[in-house]
Amino acid sequence: MTATILMIAMTLSTILAILSFWLPQMTPDMEKLSPYECGFDPLGSMRLPFSMRFFLIAILFLLFDLEIALLLPFPWAAQLNTPSIVILWAALILTLLTLGLIYEWLQGGLEWAE
């Protein structure tokens, strides 16, 4: 029974795949080949200039978002037999992120306009 259903499904999908190549009109013209973007002609550069400052701020946001993800399990981990290890790891993570933030601040990465 399942072999019959499998053969019917494979045959039907093969027929539909072959028909999808034969049915479309094969006469491309300029209108069909040009992209349509909300009624505007897509002339000019497709890429907009990207601010490097914005990229740095986005990376910093991701780092501090990762900090939240790393520190979230610590209240539950503090109930372990050795909470001093948990506090040590939390302090280490916060120290590294704080040093990184101070470094970015001193390098001028957080200043939006110069």
Swiss-Prot record:
Transmembrane parts of this sequence: 3-23, 54-74, 85-105
InterPro entries assigned to the protein according to its UniProt record, in alphabetical order: NADH_UbQ/plastoQ_OxRdtase_su3, NDAH_ubi_oxred_su3_sf
EC number: 7.1.1.2
Reaction(s) this enzyme catalyzes, per UniProt: a ubiquinone + NADH + 5 H(+)(in) = a ubiquinol + NAD(+) + 4 H(+)(out)
Chief place of localization: mitochondrion
GO terms for cellular component: mitochondrial membrane; respiratory chain complex I
Membrane topology: Multi-pass membrane protein
Keyword Chloroplast (UniProt): no
Pfam families in alphabetical order: Oxidored_q4
GO molecular function: NADH dehydrogenase (ubiquinone) activity
Family per similarity comment: Belongs to the complex I subunit 3 family.
PANTHER family xrefs: NADH-UBIQUINONE OXIDOREDUCTASE CHAIN 3
Biological role: Core subunit of the mitochondrial membrane respiratory chain NADH dehydrogenase (Complex I) that is believed to belong to the minimal assembly required for catalysis. Complex I functions in the transfer of electrons from NADH to the respiratory chain. The immediate electron acceptor for the enzyme is believed to be ubiquinone.
Name used for this protein in its record: NADH-ubiquinone oxidoreductase chain 3
The gene coding this protein: mt-nd3
